[in-house]
From Swiss-Prot:
Transmembrane segments: none annotated. NCBIfam families: PRK00558.1-5, uvrC. It comes from Bacillus mycoides (strain KBAB4) (Bacillus weihenstephanensis). The keyword Protease does not apply. The lineage of its organism: Bacteria, Bacillati, Bacillota, Bacilli, Bacillales. This is UvrABC system protein C. The gene is uvrC. It comes from the Bacteria. Belongs to the UvrC family. It is found in: Cytoplasm. One of its GO terms (cellular component) is excinuclease repair complex. Interacts with UvrB in an incision complex. CDD domains: GIY-YIG_UvrC_Cho.
């Protein structure tokens, strides 16, 4: 341990706060919180730890700490520091897991929508639903039963929905606020669990219609009842009080934490969320960090009640999230927490079982690959591939596999700068030169094996740069493809000789993964650049569209095809003034051949 670390550890306060661990570059690599800073920070440098924590501690060269006045303040500060520094050893929950909601818009003539984006607007949101199909089935039923407007833009004449009795046609008729409120109240009643009462009302109306010999109407009502029964059959009751609640459980093993969340809506268990991540804190601290990030995600709507395991400070959760938090001692809620804990434990056991099998395969693969090539085991492999179409936007990509697995933080993209026209060999020279000049300058780890997606010419270009320009002697191999553009074999040596691998061997599968991954990474980067240049050139002739607006449009739509399909309203939504939106729409509509 560094001497200055011992000195800093000796004067740590016994107060709550946050600590920031730093590596030799001064980069914050981990942020944590503690009820007692002195005890928590010292624990990293004493006693035994699992492999993941040992790796973290091995990188710590310095630390800072911030004293707070309470545990709640420490929790809030920790989340803000994680967002600010994005440390590599902290969990950062992504916003890519979203659930559908049904929304009643706050427009003068309201609509029913399905959305995955819960906004702080005046709309009313119901959900989450376990999947899009479930949300669409419920919306379809409500559309049949309640005649809110369906069209996003008001048409000039009545549409088919009016003739089907599913819309009051506010486009041509006056629909009062009272009428809309009555319909919206019925929908809210249904979505809040009042479907039994509504079903009973429909049943009464069906019998009345039948007695009046209105058989078509009776059949419509019978079908609506059948749809209600079908949807409700899929959502079994587990709680009788109809309160919306999220039930949390967790398990910890071998330095990993799994948190399971059960979404209970209107008494029904509709979905669960599973998150797994490495943990370097006490389990309770890790859980609090997780739950803070969980509800920052816009797709996770705070329910009326949050149910947490007995080991968690529910009072702190309640104050932090401003939602009722409970720790059940008995009954149905306690059973649900135990079920969530059990599922989390099973998920971790499955993960470790798969990891053990995967470790065996990958270790065997890289070990065998080294033997086949006559080199030391290549624990770190770096692979290169070029991509261009007819010489436009030439790019290259480098990926890294460490211990037989992709290390995505090590991936690099390169725009070709010095080569004119489509020259694969010179492009490879440039990229290899840039990559390893920087590696030497910044003392970055060098690979045990370099793989080039190409043949003898590519290998010769790479070897020339490494050995004759940079003085590096790193084993390298070329990946040769067959006539179907699939991995065929390796070539290695000077002159290069083929190395044939068994096609069903783990080392061959590893090479396939490397080749597919570097090709995917390169071609994706090329398409991004090509798409940008196509959109930018397509918009060059439109008055009022400069580089800034081009970037906004590119970010919003992603492709020229989507822009050509967009309406004026969608261009306005993307941030364009109405007159500019009209010009873009007119220009792209006229230019059919773009």
């Amino acid at each position: 341990m560094h001497e200055h670390l011992k000195e800093k550890l000796a004067i740590l306060p016994d107060q709550p706060g946050c600590y920031l661990m730093k590596d030799k570059q001064g980069t914050v690599i981990y942020v944590g919180k503690a009820k007692v800073l002195k005890n928590r920070v010292r624990s990293y440098f004493t006693g035994s730890h699992d492999g993941k924590t040992l790796r973290l501690v091995g990188e710590i060269v310095d630390f800072e700490y911030i004293v707070t006045s309470s545990n709640l303040e420490a929790l809030i500060l920790e989340l803000n520091l994680i967002k600010k520094y994005d440390p590599k050893y902290n969990i950062q929950l992504k916003d890519d897991k979203t659930y559908p909601f049904i929304k009643i818009t706050a427009e003068k003539q309201p609509r029913l929508l399905i959305t995955r984006n819960v906004k702080k607007d005046k709309g009313k949101y119901f959900g989450p639903y376990p999947n899009a199909q479930s949300a669409h089935e419920t919306k379809k039923l409500l559309d049949r039963m309640y005649p809110l407007r369906k069209c996003s833009n008001m048409p000039d004449k009545v549409c088919l929905y009016y003739h089907m009795g599913q819309c009051l046609a506010p486009c041509v008729k006056e629909v009062t606020d009272e009428q809309n409120k009555e319909i919206v109240d019925e929908i809210i009643k249904f979505l809040n669990g009042g479907h039994k009462e509504i079903r009973s009302e429909l049943e009464t109306k069906m019998y009345e219609a039948s007695e009046k010999l209105e058989f078509e109407r009776a059949k419509e009502l019978r079908d609506q009842i059948a749809h209600i029964d079908a949807i409700m059959e899929k959502q079994k009751m587990i709680m009788s009080d109809l309160v919306d609640r999220d039930v949390f459980g967790y398990a910890v093993d071998k330095g990993w934490m799994c948190v399971q969340v059960f979404f209970v809506r209107k008494g029904k268990l509709i979905e669960r969320d599973v998150s797994m991540f490495p943990i370097y804190d006490e389990p309770e601290e890790g859980f609090l960090t997780f739950i803070g990030q969980f509800y920052e995600n816009s797709s996770h709507f705070k329910p009326k009640e949050i149910v947490v395991p007995g080991s968690i400070d529910s009072e702190l959760v309640e104050r932090f999230l401003e939602v009722e938090a409970t720790q059940p001692k008995r009954g149905k809620k306690k059973d649900l927490v135990e079920l969530a804990n059990k599922n989390a434990k099973i998920a971790l056991e499955e993960k470790f079982h798969l990891i053990e099998r995967d470790e065996e395969r990958t270790v065997k693969a890289i070990d065998n690959l080294g033997k086949q090539l006559g080199i030391e085991t290549p624990y770190r492999i770096e692979a290169f591939d070029n991509s261009n179409i007819q010489g436009t936007n030439p790019v290259s990509a480098m990926i890294a596999f460490i211990d037989g697995k992709p290390a995505k933080k090590e991936y690099r993209k390169y725009k070709i700068k010095t080569v004119q026209g489509p020259d694969d060999y010179e492009s490879m020279r440039e990229v290899v030169r840039r990559r390893y000049t920087r590696a030497l300058k910044e003392n970055l780890p060098l690979p045990d094996l370099i793989i080039i997606d190409g043949g003898k010419g590519h290998l010769a270009a790479t070897s020339d740069v490494l050995e004759n320009e940079l003085g590096l002697y790193i084993p390298m191999a070329g990946l040769v493809k067959d006539d179907k553009h699939k991995t065929s074999h390796l070539i290695i040596g000077d002159p290069p000789e083929p190395v044939m691998l068994e096609r069903n061997s783990q080392e061959f599968y590893l090479l396939q993964r490397i080749q597919d991954e570097v090709h995917r990474f390169a071609i994706t980067f090329h398409r991004q650049l090509h798409g940008k240049s196509v959109i930018q050139s397509a918009l060059d002739d439109i008055p009022g569209i400069g580089d800034k607006r081009k970037k906004v449009l590119l970010k919003h739509f992603g492709s020229l095809k989507k822009m050509k399909e967009a309406s004026i309203a969608e261009f306005v939504e993307a941030g364009m003034p109405k007159n500019v939106a009209e010009m873009i729409y007119t220009y792209l509509t006229d230019k059919k051949t773009l």
